[in-house]
């Protein structure tokens, strides 16, 4: 294992060479882009790199006079000759994945799935760019160390920073996990404003430096409205590229239907979560199927479907906290993987998946200009299309109207962050987000 420290005079070409395995820690924020307090000038940029198992390793050499070196950690002070690296010809072109909230519990599960090849495949090298805060920077360095110690051959580069403009540079995927949790006594309107400011800033950064076709998955709550804020602040990126994560809700719904029907959950298909990622979300049992049959033909207890099933899915996160003592992290990371793979692998014939997307032009009569979870299919090219062959009854329409009204009210609450005027906050009900205390 080798780690390298570079001083700030290194060229950009050195830092981004495709043949270099590097962990880059940029700890000096750009003041005009980042609202966080600046770090001390004594902190220096650092790089570390993982040596492939078949790589010839040259003796370690010092990069500068030891007396003039700043404090550094172990092998961060050393550099190795990596020119002997042998390229793997079957590998695809490297892709860049940015992750915010990278020192958190969800990321702690997710990053290792990404680095292992589980998500994008065994021949897809990746660069991870990890965004933290000034407070979490030390923990972020620990995350980078663990990634390095894991010797993932597909992981070619890791960048850590507190500046979104650095982390989102050339990003092809942006997984926005970081958000402030709802504290005791905090009104939902306050949470919308606090986190909305974070996602407005990140939207601007994506707009400025990310790939023009970057795919963005918003996980931080309230994820639907945070995704709307983000896309409104990124006009150069197609609105269709922004997603709010509702895949965990879909997975939970499939699990509950499978339990009730006495089958394994791979028999459940065509499951849609409609609307907001809150307790107004609508798990759709009308269009879902179990072993190819409509759910209502398999589960005859329709009262259970309308009452107990729906409530179980809506409140599953809170129930987990009561048992576990903390909100879901591992299952959330699994659902992020599922959400990504649904976009890069063709959807099985006749099936679909749920994701929160921009509603403008939707075929369901749902209000436009919000982010609403709907059924989608993909050809595996990172894009998607809305499913048109779904049916509605009065019960489903009534539930959709409630979650739609909530999202429209949230949109008014953040008008000052989307460039649509003065915020007017009159939420129809203080619904708890799944997983909140």
From Swiss-Prot:
Catalytic activity, as annotated: (S)-malate + NADP(+) = oxaloacetate + NADPH + H(+)
Statement: the UniProt record of this protein carries the keyword Metal-binding: no
Chief localization: plastid
UniProt GO BP: malate metabolic process
Annotated compartments: Plastid, Chloroplast
Regulation of activity: Chloroplast NADP-MDH is activated upon illumination. In order to be enzymatically active, disulfides bridges on the protein must be reduced by thioredoxin which receives electrons from ferredoxin and the electron transport system of photosynthesis.
Record: residues binding NAD(+): 202
EC id: 1.1.1.82
Residue span of the annotated presequence: 1-49
Any one GO cellular component localisation term in the record: chloroplast
Active site: 277 (proton acceptor)
UniProt site (Activation of NADP-MDH): 72, 77
Subunit structure and binding partners: Homodimer.
Function: The chloroplastic, NADP-dependent form is essential for the photosynthesis C4 cycle, which allows plants to circumvent the problem of photorespiration. In C4 plants, NADP-MDH activity acts to convert oxaloacetate to malate in chloroplasts of mesophyll cells for transport to the bundle sheath cells.
Name recorded for this polypeptide: Malate dehydrogenase [NADP], chloroplastic
Taxonomic lineage of the native organism: Eukaryota, Viridiplantae, Streptophyta, Embryophyta, Tracheophyta
């Amino acid at each position: 294992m080798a780690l390298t420290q570079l001083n700030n005079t290194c060229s950009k070409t050195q830092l981004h060479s495709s043949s270099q395995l590097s962990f880059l820690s940029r700890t000096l924020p750009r003041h005009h882009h980042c609202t966080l307090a600046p770090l001390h000038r004594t902190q220096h940029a650092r790089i570390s790199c993982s040596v492939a198992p078949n790589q010839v390793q040259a003796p370690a050499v010092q990069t500068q006079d030891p007396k003039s070196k700043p404090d550094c950690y172990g092998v961060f002070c050393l550099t190795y000759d990596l020119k002997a690296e042998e390229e793997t010809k079957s590998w695809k072109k490297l892709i860049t994945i940015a992750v915010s909230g990278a020192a958190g519990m969800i990321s702690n599960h997710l990053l290792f799935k990404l680095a292992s090849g589980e998500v994008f495949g065994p021949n897809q090298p990746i660069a991870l760019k990890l965004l933290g805060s000034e407070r979490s920077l030390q923990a972020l360095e620990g995350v980078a160390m663990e990634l390095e110690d894991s010797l993932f051959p597909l992981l070619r580069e890791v960048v850590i920073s507190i500046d979104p403009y650095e982390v989102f540079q050339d990003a092809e995927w942006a997984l926005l996990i970081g958000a402030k949790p709802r504290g005791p006594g905090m009104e939902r309107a306050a949470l919308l404003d606090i986190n909305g400011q974070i996602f407005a800033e990140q939207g601007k950064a994506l707009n400025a430096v990310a790939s023009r076709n970057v795919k963005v998955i918003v996980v931080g709550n309230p994820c639907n409205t945070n995704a709307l804020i983000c896309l409104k602040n990124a006009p150069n990126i197609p609105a269709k590229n922004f997603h709010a994560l509702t895949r965990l809700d879909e997975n939970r719904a499939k699990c509950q239907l499978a339990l009730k029907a006495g089958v394994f959950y791979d028999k459940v298909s065509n499951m849609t979560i409609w609307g907001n990622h809150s307790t107004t979300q609508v798990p759709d049992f009308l269009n879902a199927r179990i072993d190819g049959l409509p759910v209502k033909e398999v589960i005859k207890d329709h009262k259970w479907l309308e009452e107990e099933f729906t409530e179980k899915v809506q409140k599953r996160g809170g129930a987990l906290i009561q048992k576990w003592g903390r909100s879901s992290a591992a299952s959330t990371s699994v659902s992020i993987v599922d959400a990504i793979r649904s976009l890069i692998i063709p959807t099985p014939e006749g099936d679909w998946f749920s994701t929160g997307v921009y509603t403008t032009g939707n075929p369901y009569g749902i209000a436009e200009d919000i982010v609403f979870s709907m059924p989608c299919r993909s050809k595996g090219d990172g894009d998607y299309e809305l499913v048109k062959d779904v049916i509605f009854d009065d019960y489903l329409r009534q539930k959709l109207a409630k979650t739609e009204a909530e999202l429209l009210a949230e949109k008014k609450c953040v008008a000052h962050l989307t460039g649509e005027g003065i915020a007017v906050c009159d939420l129809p009900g203080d619904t708890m987000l799944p997983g909140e205390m």
